[in-house]
Amino acid sequence: MTIQELHTHAMELAEQADFLNMQGKDAEAKSLYEQSLQAEKEAAYQARNQQIGEPSESVLFRSAASLAYGLKDFREAERFICMGLAGNPPLDVAHELRELYDQVSLERNLEQMNMNLPENQHEAVTITIPVKERNLLKVLVRKFGWACVF
């Protein structure tokens, strides 16, 4: 398959997996997400090996990293993020890769600290975060669904 065909196939599989997820068919969805990741991974590595250039290469690695992140394969997600940043991605893609890296790092740290709390164990907390730490705050808000006042 060509790079474009692999990428298209990966996105179709991910879309099917999303649909299954909405139906509560988690095991079937996970299987499709894994197949999607394999296709996107192959597309990304083919793109890099064939040196098709930017932004295509970094976008494919970002996509593969997102799929790995969704599957909670944080180490694999980190690898794809690094591969995407190792090229010469456009600034916006590099920014997205770094934001995804922040999310992956947070998840890995929480996993290592065994802090995955059940939904019903959330509580109200007030914190002050310096302006330069806003990206971390965004990650925390997305992860935990926190309400924030800026």
Residue map of PLM features:
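Helical anchoring/docking segments at protein termini
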Residues: 1, 112-150
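Helix-turn-helix repeat elements of alpha-solenoid scaffolds
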Residues: 29-42, 74-76
